[in-house]
Amino acid sequence: MTRIIAGAAGSLSLAVPRSGTRPTSDRVREAIFSALEARDAIDGSVVLDLYAGSGALGLESASRGAVEVVLVERAKPAADVCRRNADAVTRAIGRGAARIRVVVKPVAAYLETAPAGVDLAFIDPPYDLDEAAVARDLALLAPLLNAEALVVVERSARSPEPAWPSGIELERRRDYGETTLWWATTADPAADEPAADALAAAEPAADEPVA
């Protein structure tokens, strides 16, 4: 089991698929969401959780004020877990809960026909997914992003930097043991220095424990 860390559904336990997924650790999720909260990137946002697994990243966003969350997961058993978790989060939040959808499709197939207007996207594929597939996903995602949208890519620390398409620019990299987070944005980095500073201040160092 894992849990929602904070927000309207804080402390709610989430189911995880029995196999075939690699849930983001609580430590890494806390680091991600501390940084996102510091730059006010969640409240009122439209969120994509690609390779959703249990849906923990998207559902954490819903708990913290996102208005729409799409969980994309091709494996039906994992998608069924996403639905159960989404129902539990919706009940816990109650009135004003985000609109949460679960899409049972390969990520690329979803992105090819998805609507634009995304504020925040999580890409957390299996570590053994090849780099060409990650690059394809990013290229399909780019035209769907709003101005100053954020993209968080979780990969193995042994994986190379993703190939960023036109329209998405690397902001920073953070390492947490065997996990690397790549933060990227559609904004001009020179114009977004205060936000980048907030991210650096809020995010724990790679060797710093998260409370």
Regions from the language model: what does each represent?
Residues M1-A211:
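Class I S-adenosyl-L-methionine-dependent methyltransferase catalytic core
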